[in-house]
Curated annotation (Swiss-Prot):
One of its GO terms (molecular function) is GTP binding. One of its GO terms (biological process) is cell division. Residues 48-55 are annotated as: G1 motif. The gene is SEPTIN11. It comes from Macaca fascicularis (Crab-eating macaque). This is Septin-11. Keywords: Acetylation, Cell cycle, Cell division, Cell projection, Coiled coil, Cytoplasm, Cytoskeleton, GTP-binding, Nucleotide-binding, Phosphoprotein, Synapse. Residues 38-304 form the Septin-type G domain. The modification Phosphoserine is found at residue 9. Residues 100-103 are annotated as: G3 motif. Residues 183-186 are annotated as: G4 motif.
Amino acid sequence: MAVAVGRPSNEELRNLSLSGHVGFDSLPDQLVNKSTSQGFCFNILCVGETGIGKSTLMDTLFNTKFESDPATHNEPGVRLKARSYELQESNVRLKLTIVDTVGFGDQINKDDSYKPIVEYIDAQFEAYLQEELKIKRSLFNYHDTRIHACLYFIAPTGHSLKSLDLVTTKKLDSKVNIIPIIAKADTIAKNELHKFKSKIMSELVSNGVQIYQFPTDEETVAEINATMSVHLPFAVVGSTEEVKIGNKMAKARQYPWGVVQVENENHCDFVKLREMLIRVNMEDLREQTHTRHYELYRRCKLEEMGFKDTDPDSKPFSLQETYEAKRNEFLGELQKKEEEMRQMFVMRVKEKEAELKEAEKELHEKFDLLKRTHQEEKKKVEDKKKELEEEVNNFQKKKAAVQLLQSQAQQSGAQQTKKDKDKKNSPWLCTE
């Protein structure tokens, strides 16, 4: 049986040349084919005040008309509404989810406006973490709802960021890739727009807000990303209406004083935003979400559960050691709880026994009292019975005596009557 032996990390690997074709040069093609068959997902969070143009910009970015309900300024609080769509361009399928912050900035008290947004982002991280922690995972078919990009719409005031913007971006920068954009940029003069951009970036830096940094470490995108980064925040204009300009139709906004073309880089930064968000850095946004923001959330959650990479002496911990340590800790807590429950049970039993003994004592006392009362009542009844029996006997004796006297009287009366009768019938009495 072959045993794999780990190489030291500092040992250099030898470069070998192949004597013939093997076939692993098709790995990029395999990866492309697999990714194409699986499709991709991309989730955008649009944060901005009601009526600032979030829905219009999404329609313009993806060159389609998404469902959207007209929002009012009467929302009692901020709520997030997510809608998913299946898009296809050539043979590439994209599952796009757009999350809108309905009612953001409409309340008088805006202190907690950021909380529903943070809770939503954390909820998506938690759902993915729970799927990862399952024994039988199914990440292949899992619909990833983690937010990959946050387009933060800044009102075109021309002065500075609102306190709500600073607070919200500061709360979100460790959880999502923030791309600040100035909405309705056609309402600001060009010279004021440059000052406004500089002011926004200065305030973000001074308040420690970390926005998404376009990657410059890859040669293929380094130059374009470095060039585009200086234009942040992007000043955009959105429109789905087409206006005839010269001999062709173009997406634009028609004003009495002229036309603002959406895809004209001299008019706004819409094309730059589309290039950076979709055509150049979409995969990097997805990767940053997983490797940076989600990993931070995952690490914090696992540390809350007691899992760490190092022990108190900063020595590396393996997952098995962490598991055993937590298992022993939980077993110790379980035994402690069992002992506490046992002692509590014994105490409850003793208390119940004392209550039962007290109740038994009270019952015995009541029984003895009832028994004595019964005996006393019985004695009274027996005494009364004896008195009645004596009275009956006396009565019977008197009755017998009376009857005897009556009988004697009757007998003596009968004898006297007979004597008188005999006297009358006697012959001697007649001679006389």
